[in-house]
From Swiss-Prot:
Function: Component of the eukaryotic translation initiation factor 3 (eIF-3) complex, which is involved in protein synthesis of a specialized repertoire of mRNAs and, together with other initiation factors, stimulates binding of mRNA and methionyl-tRNAi to the 40S ribosome. The eIF-3 complex specifically targets and initiates translation of a subset of mRNAs involved in cell proliferation.
Family note: Belongs to the eIF-3 subunit F family.
Keywords associated with the record: Cytoplasm, Initiation factor, Protein biosynthesis
Region (Disordered): 310-342
InterPro entries noted in UniProt: eIF3f (IPR027531), EIF3F/CSN6-like_C (IPR024969), JAMM/MPN+_dom (IPR000555), MPN (IPR037518)
GO cellular component: eukaryotic 43S preinitiation complex; eukaryotic 48S preinitiation complex; eukaryotic translation initiation factor 3 complex, eIF3e; eukaryotic translation initiation factor 3 complex, eIF3m
HAMAP family the record matches: eIF3f
GO biological process: formation of cytoplasmic translation initiation complex; translational initiation
Quaternary structure annotation from Swiss-Prot or TrEMBL: Component of the eukaryotic translation initiation factor 3 (eIF-3) complex.
Organism: Phaeosphaeria nodorum (strain SN15 / ATCC MYA-4574 / FGSC 10173)
Pfam family, one: MitMem_reg
Location of the protein in the cell: Cytoplasm
UniProt-recorded name of the protein: Eukaryotic translation initiation factor 3 subunit F
Length: 342
């Protein structure tokens, strides 16, 4: 990943500004949520076969001083690109931006993305569009995120901001200097578990993976902790037996980790663990009960509708039969009267 690269931050002008308006020149740190990357990859998979790259808008949050940006959301923007020109649906971009900001008032426009690592004149045009005043990110710099989607290769991501350093007035609209800035893929424990579950499907032929239950997840987590403890124990034993080279940094890390362990009696730990297991079982039982009730309710509703329709048909049949019987009785009575008169 590109977040391991080294960067040199420069104070940069972002373009001509009116009197009293000062652009932000502080260094940037960009954090990217996994769901934004997944949306970009999904957009790339659904692109037309003759389209080399796709672009879209990045939404997220920005710190008060503008030095920290977190990319949380994104959406695709239609565009056509040839060797001579590029056309972006600006009306669609403005309408979608207004809808997203209405649905998520805490998010703001932070930049745009492209599924290609190439930076060309068209990239500068789009960058200037997102950095402009009014509908752009001014006075903050627009972040340009590139995500490589070459089949068979690792996914590489890079983030840039722009500055018109050395750009003449005639080329100011379609030229800019892209400056790389550090970034990281930020995810929590819940998202990490989801990513591990998704990545486990890559080794299967059907590319699918069943979702584990709470008990299975707990068992897997406990087994993972036991494996790590066994690994640490083997390392310490090898160091004591002079079979492995000691590391002062690793020893200090282990001491700090042990110092964070709470001083709790093993019996209390076992009791709390059993209580947690009982809570998990109760939640699982209640979830299954609710699922069963919903299924039973749907079946009863379907059965009631079916029985109601059958009763209605039966009632109509009885009514028709009664009418036919009455008509037959009247005809028989008429024949008897004519016979008597004769």
């Amino acid at each position: 990943m590109s977040e391991r690269d080294s960067f040199l931050h420069l104070a940069r002008p972002l373009g001509p500004a009116p009197v009293g308006a000062q652009p932000s020149t502080a260094p940037l740190n960009v954090a990217i949520q996994p769901q934004a990357v997944f949306s970009i990859l999904d957009h790339s998979l659904r692109r037309p076969a003759d389209q080399e790259r796709v672009i879209g808008t990045l939404l997220g949050t920005r710190s008060e001083d503008g030095t920290e940006i977190e990319i949380r959301n994104c959406y695709a923007v239609p565009h056509t690109e040839t060797a001579e020109q590029v056309e972006v649906d600006m009306d669609y971009q403005k309408q979608m931006l207004a809808l997203h900001l209405r649905a998520n008032p805490r998010e703001v426009l932070v930049g745009w993305y492209a599924t290609s690592s190439d930076l060309n004149t068209f990239s500068a045009l789009i960058q200037n569009f997102y950095s402009q005043q009014g509908d752009g990110t001014w006075p903050h710099p627009a972040v340009h995120l590139t995500v490589s989607t070459v089949p068979g290769q690792d996914i590489e991501s890079r983030t840039y901001i722009s500055a018109p350093i050395g750009v003449t007035a005639e080329r100011a609209a379609d030229s800019c200097l892209f400056i790389p800035v550090p970034h990281e893929i930020k995810y929590g424990e819940a998202e990490k578990s989801g990513l591990e579950l998704i990545s486990s499907a890559k080794d299967r032929e059907d590319r699918s993976q069943e979702i584990m239950t709470d008990l299975d997840s707990l068992e897997r987590a406990v087994q993972h902790v036991l494996d790590m403890l066994e690994r640490v124990s083997n390392y310490v034993n090898n160091v004591l037996d002079e079979e492995a080279e000691p590391s002062s940094a690793l020893g200090q890390f282990l001491m700090n980790a042990l110092s964070l362990a709470p001083k709790v009696d093993p019996a209390d730990i076992e009791r709390d663990f059993n209580n947690h297991i009982q809570d998990v079982l109760v939640v699982s039982y209640l979830a299954n009960t609710i699922r069963t009730q919903i299924d039973l309710s749907n079946r009863l509703a379907t059965a009631a509708l079916t029985m109601g329709g059958t009763d209605a048909l039966a009632g109509d049949g009885q009514k028709d039969g009664g009418d036919r019987k009455q008509g037959g009785d009247r005809r028989n009575k008429g024949r008897q009267q004519r016979t008597q008169e004769a």
